[in-house]
């Protein structure tokens, strides 16, 4: 049910008192979180850096995708937020806001332009300089090694992630990252959102590397929607586990870091209380959460997936199962919203079937929406969904250490007076605290995003997620902090009081981000 957003800022000298409606009534400050909990914000290399053809960087699959005209807005990330040139200014802004942590990704095709072999010295200078700036600012560093930007050379050579050859190349790339940056980087994430990339990139072909097959996807020049999503995840897990083993054997004693993997998360509510709808909801959870977490905890894929995909689902050898099991120190969670789910009665078992048919579930953002068989990012503000997701993980897979690595609200408006974003963030931060008090082992929270970015589906003009606005019409990509940056700063630096009142679902601007 749609309800208006309500926000009242009451200034009682200092700190601020923020009254919001959202999760059940809760009043809190920064000090209510554990002493080692870190609040931050994030960016991603292709969306942030720019400098696409500078200093030895070579094309990634994202460059190929956007330059082929497949992006809906026909825009590229060639300049993006120009972080390649403006990172020092950005770190200064982070410090002024009071960020305790910053999560960014490394561009593989910048660091190792050929995908393997020689390291780009200019890239080393860039990442070392940025890391050093963060260290000087006292900001905790969280590095992601891969987010959908494979060097195009490896995609051309052997098909990238659908080939087992990727395991050795990714491990060698990770080795360079650990060796060059690990003396200052403590928090490592191997792969970001593989469960989302599987459908978007390899079943539907709507994101890089734009692989799909008829009749399941369209506008693809190559691919196999029946098997490639499963190969991609399988090799992602093996590459992740190989990198973790390398880190633990070669670097962990000296560097004392931790390493994990990230999953895209949404919460699912059955459309009705029927057994059929509840079954579809549980099946969707297995494909979103269990596809990654089940092998990491139990060494194999969920039985639900084995039954649905059959022989198309790869099998772990005993050695691979042992390597994958417990190959993490934490799980990164990207969470934005919730959706309604129902059984897809139109799916009939056929010799040729894709991931979407295997899930056999329909999704609705609201109960009045037309259902779609594709995992659809939600647009409702539902902080309880985050609580449910954390509880589900704890009950099914144990009380795993979790970093919320992305959570945020996007708006089509470029306004600096982003009250809706403040509303959203306050509710989800409150939900995080409630989950911690209920026993969830959440170690950190990173909002999405630090600055406005080149958005994966929306380009420059459709959605703006940043605490800091970026003028994409300006050659200098001028920065200007939004009201949400001031609010976040008051919470982090001045221990301002936030009170969130119970309300339930609240409709807001889209905050879905893959």
UniProtKB/Swiss-Prot annotation:
In terms of PANTHER family, this protein maps to:
BETA-GLUCOSIDASE 20, GLYCOSYL HYDROLASE
Record organism? Oryza sativa subsp. japonica (Rice)
Gene Ontology biological process: carbohydrate metabolic process
Q: Which UniProt keywords apply?
A: Disulfide bond, Glycoprotein, Glycosidase, Hydrolase, Signal
Record-listed a beta-D-glucoside binding positions = 47, 147, 336, 406, 448, 465
**Which family does the record claim for this protein?**
Belongs to the glycosyl hydrolase 1 family.
**Which Cys-Cys disulfides exist here?**
212-220
Q: Which gene encodes it?
A: BGLU21
Q: Which reaction does it catalyse?
A: Hydrolysis of terminal, non-reducing beta-D-glucosyl residues with release of beta-D-glucose
Q: Signal peptide span per the entry?
A: 1-25
User: Superkingdom of this entry's organism?
Assistant: Eukaryota
> Could you tell me the EC number(s) of this protein?
3.2.1.21
Q: What is the protein name stated in its UniProt record?
A: Beta-glucosidase 21
Active-site residue numbers: 193, 406
- What is the top EC class of this enzyme, as a single word? hydrolase
Where would I find glycosylation on this chain? 219, 224, 407, 494
| GO MF | beta-D-fucosidase activity; beta-galactosidase activity; beta-glucosidase activity
């Amino acid at each position: 049910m749609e309800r208006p957003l309500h926000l009242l800022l009451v200034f009682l000298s200092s700190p601020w008192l923020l009254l919001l409606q959202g999760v059940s009534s809760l009043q809190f400050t920064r000090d209510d979180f554990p002493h080692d909990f870190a609040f931050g914000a994030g960016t991603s290399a292709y969306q942030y850096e720019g400098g696409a053809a500078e200093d030895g960087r070579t094309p990634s699959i994202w460059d190929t995708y956007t330059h082929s005209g497949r992006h809906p807005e026909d825009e590229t990330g060639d300049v993006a937020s120009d972080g390649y040139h403006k990172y020092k200014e950005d770190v200064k802004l982070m410090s002024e806001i009071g960020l305790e942590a910053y999560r960014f990704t490394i561009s593989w095709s910048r660091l190792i332009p050929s995908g393997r072999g020689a390291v780009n010295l200019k890239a080393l200078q860039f990442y070392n300089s940025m890391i050093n700036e963060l260290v000087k600012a006292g900001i905790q560093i969280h590095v992601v090694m891969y987010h959908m930007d494979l060097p195009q050379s490896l995609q051309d050579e052997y098909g990238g992630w659908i080939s087992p050859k990727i395991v050795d190349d990714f491990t060698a790339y990770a080795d360079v990252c650990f060796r060059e940056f690990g003396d200052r980087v403590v928090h490592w994430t191997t792969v970001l959102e593989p469960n989302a990339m599987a459908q978007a990139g390899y079943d539907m072909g709507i994101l890089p590397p734009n692989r799909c097959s008829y009749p399941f996807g369209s506008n693809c020049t190559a691919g196999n929607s029946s098997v490639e999503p499963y190969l991609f995840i399988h090799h992602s897990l093996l590459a992740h586990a190989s990198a973790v083993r390398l880190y633990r054997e070669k670097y962990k004693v000296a560097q004392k870091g931790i390493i994990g993997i990230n999953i895209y998360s949404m919460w699912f509510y059955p459309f009705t209380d029927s057994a059929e709808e509840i079954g579809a909801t549980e099946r969707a959870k297995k494909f979103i959460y269990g596809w990654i977490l089940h092998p990491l905890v139990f060494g194999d894929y969920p039985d639900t997936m084995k039954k649905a995909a059959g022989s198309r689902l790869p099998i772990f050898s005993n050695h691979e199962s042992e390597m994958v099991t417990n190959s993490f120190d934490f799980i990164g969670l990207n969470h934005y919203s919730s959706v309604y789910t129902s059984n897809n009665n139109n799916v009939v078992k056929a010799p040729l079937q894709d991931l979407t048919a295997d899930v056999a579930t329909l999704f609705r953002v609201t109960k009045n929406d037309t259902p779609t068989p594709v995992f659809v990012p939600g647009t409702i503000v539902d902080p309880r969904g985050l609580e449910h997701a954390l509880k589900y993980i704890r009950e099914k897979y144990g009380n795993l250490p979790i970093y919320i690595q992305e959570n945020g609200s996007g708006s089509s408006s470029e306004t600096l007076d982003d009250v809706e974003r403040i509303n959203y963030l306050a509710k989800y931060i409150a939900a995080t605290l409630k989950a911690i008090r209920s026993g969830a082992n959440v170690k950190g929270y990173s909002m999405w995003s630090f600055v406005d970015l080149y958005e994966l589906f929306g380009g420059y003009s459709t959605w703006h997620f940043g605490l800091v606005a970026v003028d994409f019409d300006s050659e200098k990509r001028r920065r200007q902090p939004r009201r949400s940056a001031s609010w976040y700063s008051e919470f982090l630096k001045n221990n301002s009081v936030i009170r969130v009142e119970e309300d339930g679902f609240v409709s807001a601007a889209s905050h879905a981000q893959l």
